[in-house]
């Protein structure tokens, strides 16, 4: 997170409205760093599978650059252009020296990094004993709604369904102000988190 916590605190003290999003442990870390509640702070956490080793990512990125003859300029870890069941990684490479941009899609089943990640082989040690799974300090939690086909088949489509968990009154206010054009269905908390 670098110096993000300090920047958030500075913005909060100056009276700016701040929306902070991150993994559960990042949100919890911010709240602990701040040491008090701020009315002008809204926190959203993303249900997290875990965070892979930064060293492994660096080596993977270097490997892809060498293999594809370019510089990695962007990455979408869960690209769902072909639907959310067969997601994969979309990598944006800038070729050298021609300066052309190429996009590569690698299915989750064909990418060694994604396979290691999804099978929990490369997560940080703290992820295996994650305390943020049980203690949520965010106002809203968002995620892919894995298992929607079993809970609410009418909400299942090929592009994916999002799960929103409202955790505080502040989170509820934001959700109510943003949901006017959403197709929604309320489900139990247990059904919502079962696949995550």
Regions found by a protein language model. Name each.
Residues 1-196:
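Iron-sulfur-associated redox domains of electron-transfer enzymes in respiratory
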